[in-house]
Amino acid sequence: MKTRAVILAGGEGSRLVVLTAKRAKPAVPFAGKYRIIDFTLSNCVNSGIFDVMILTQYRPHSLNSHIGAGRPWDLDRGFTGGVRLYQPYKGRADTDWYVGTADAIQQNFSFLKDTNPELVLILAGDHIYEMDYDAMLSFHTDHQSDLTIATIRVAREEATRMGILATDDNYRVTQFMEKPKEPPDTLASMGIYVFSLPVLDKVLSEDAKRKDSHHDFGKDIIPHMVKTGMRVFAFPFGGYWVDVGTIDSYWRAHMDLLKHPPELDLNDRTWIIHTRSEERPPALIQPGAVARDCLISDGVIIAPGAVVERSVLSPGVYVGPQAVVRESIILTDASIEAGACVERAIIDKDVTVGHNASVGRIVPDAPDLGIATVGKSAQIPGGVVVGRGATIGLNVGPDHFSRAGVRDGTTLEREPFRAGM
């Protein structure tokens, strides 16, 4: 059946703090060479879906630049589909920014129906997973479903921040709870939905008229459909899936890539993750350098005597002589100078960690203070110590640091960033 995918890519992702201060969550780099949205886009084309809408909102500039006309994903098409990006606009009868996920679709429904799809596949642009959507579309048709929700089993401690479902023996959803304080089950919504176009039109139109609605799929649309007896089914997914919505989950997802075997195999040639790549020379690991259990991107230089272990290095990263990088994520064109030590940290683009400086630390059997993070273009002067779980904001320069450094779990910032959503 003719299917159109709609990717919701407007999320602020404020729990990623400095990583999303200047970019949308789907545009955050992942696994060295990719952006988070690459996984959803690649799932679409690998599933034979070449008609894709992307709804953006928060700081869309880097995302728009990355996707462009869609060529890396074979989505630079005209009359046969392709990718189109839509941002909030102000019309006579329209609001400004989207107030919820359902509102985002509703405001763009006139564009959505332009290509006359029979089915609409609604996706999140900020999850890491590989999935053949064709199996879910067939499940939807076979069950004559009004709505099909992709589901996965999660740990009970994660269930409180997700939509949780109960089903009967035929996968029909009998109950749906958005972020319950005491989840009765661990079957969670993945934020992936299949509707027929007429059903989607009906439920969105009805929801738009409800003054007490948040205009959100998880909070309003799905519970109402279940309550009123519509045919809502759960499609079980058994693969790897993670919402990298926090610093900890983002870091852990990278560590998952370094396991033997990895929980998500980026080398699977039957399911290629496509991306827009810069032209960079091959990585250079100089004599005397050590690199173990790492993902190393093009343009990386690891100098003599440096040690890099269980880490992910993005394009253009420099690791100087005698420097140490362990269990860390280093983003594009960051420089770890001679003798510096970076452990359990995330270093954003264009950061310099000065000679003999230290960011984060691995302390066996000590309380977990989280992952140290350093925002884009920050400059950490030589010899300064940035503690475990500390946060350095964007563009923080050498003059902002004291000799005492930055204590464990504290924040040093130049430009305030919003957090807490």
Give each language-model segment a name:
Residues 1-4, 198, 206-421:
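Left-handed beta-helix
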Residues 1-258, 368-370, 376-377, 407-421:
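Unchanged
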